[in-house]
A protein has these predicted regions:
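ABC ATPase NBD coupling module
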Residues: 18-20, 74-90, 108, 116, ...
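The feature captures the beta-strand-to-loop junction immediately N-terminal to the Walker
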Residues: 42-44
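Conserved ABC transporter NBD signature motif
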Residues: 65-73
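Conserved ABC ATPase signature
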Residues: 148-152, 156
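A short, surface-exposed alpha-helical micro-motif characterized by mixed small hydrophobic
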Residues: 214-216
Length: 356
């Protein structure tokens, strides 16, 4: 059964520039969400990801197209109907800190849910419901109840907000960049929580710019560019056999940090710079960052396998071989293969992005 359906949704914003023209944020976006699945909505900044989340949460009105929930157009909801809609469709956002008033205890967000949706529930029953919801997000109620926001970690705050959604009998969770402000270990906890909730029948829209996170958590993936869907399908298929050039470009930029660099047999050295083939002997091979405009190494995955850094090097790259001789610069396309004797492992601090 389809829980939520987006059908040919477009959204135009009026530009603030002189002339006040219309700027498209979404272009005929269509997809369906069903119970018990995670859909990753992936794209660069400005691709329209957050706009889709706002449309689903009735925070933005589509210029054209419809969004239906259990067969009913959400634009038709008002009053009690809209209140019921928000009971079943909830959002959790990038910055958990902004959802709390620092002068009140963090669990006050549950009091607001109670007064709006469960005013007749007694104190004891409500406390049991709150503790059950907090347990469901892998937190100990004794560790978080009664605490102020500044006394909780970002991960605890985010999970408390997910627990608030669970109190409402939520069916669809819009998770907009919810782990981008969390540290690495906490990210895994929240991702695993989403997988657990999916198993309990929750439909989750996981909005992210990070393909590796989407690959980890989702059943289906939507790739968005300039407000339009360029590719959509099973996550394994999208990541394993991408069809659109934009998807391929995004995937080549993903660092595979789980892969350890080893002295495994590789093909013989073959370097082509500006169309000229050139063989390199068994010398030192390095990958360095470069601030030179246009310098780029086509096979950036080599850097990803050589470094254990958690951050992607933001500068363009160039290949430098024996004696510091650059074989790639400008707009040249380079294919690189290295023999094991030519490989040397460097500590992460040898591969550091230049200061911005």
């Amino acid at each position: 059964m389809t829980t939520l359906k987006v059908d040919q949704v477009s959204k135009l914003y009026r530009s603030s520039a002189r002339g006040g023209g219309l700027t498209p944020a979404l272009r005929k976006v269509s997809f369906e969400m069903k119970p018990g699945e995670v859909i990753s909505l992936i794209g660069e900044s400005g691709s329209g990801k957050t706009t889709i989340g706002k449309v689903l949460l009735r925070l933005a009105k589509p210029t054209s197209g419809t969004v239906t929930f259990d067969g009913k157009d959400i634009a038709s909801y008002s009053g009690r109907g809209l209140k019921d809609y928000y009971r079943h469709v909830q959002g959790v956002f990038q910055d958990p800190f902004s959802s709390y008033n620092p002068i009140y205890r963090a669990d006050r967000v549950y009091d607001l849910v109670r007064s709006s949706y469960f005013p007749k529930v007694g104190d004891r029953e409500w406390s049991e419901k709150v503790e059950a919801a907090i347990d469901a997000v892998a937190l100990n109620p004794a560790d978080v109840l009664g605490k102020y926001p500044h006394q909780l970690s970002g991960g605890q705050q985010q999970r408390l907000l997910i627990a608030r959604a669970l109190l409402l009998d939520v069916k669809v969770l819009v998770a907009d960049e919810i782990i981008s402000m969390l540290d690495a270990s906490t990210r895994v906890d929240v991702l695993n929580l989403l997988v657990k909730l999916k198993g309990q029948g929750l439909a989750i829209l996981f909005i992210t710019h990070d393909l590796s996170l989407g690959n980890y958590v989702s059943d289906r993936t939507i790739i968005l560019r300039h407000g339009a869907i360029v590719e959509m399908g099973a996550t394994g298929k999208i990541f394993g056999n991408p069809q659109h050039d934009y998807t391929k470009m995004l995937l080549t930029a993903v660092p595979e940090l789980h892969k350890k660099w080893q002295h495994a047999p590789l093909a013989p050295v073959a370097v082509s710079a500006n169309g000229a083939g050139e063989g390199l002997g068994a010398g030192t091979a390095e990958l360095l960052t470069s601030s030179a405009p246009g310098s780029r190494l086509a096979q950036a995955s080599i850097l990803e396998e050589l470094t254990h850094a958690e951050q992607v090097v933001k500068r363009d790259l160039r290949a430098v071989f024996g004696g510091g001789r650059a074989v790639a610069s400008g707009k040249s396309q380079v294919a690189v293969a290295l023999e094991p004797p030519a490989l040397h492992e460097f500590e992460p601090d040898h591969l550091v992005a230049e200061p911005e």
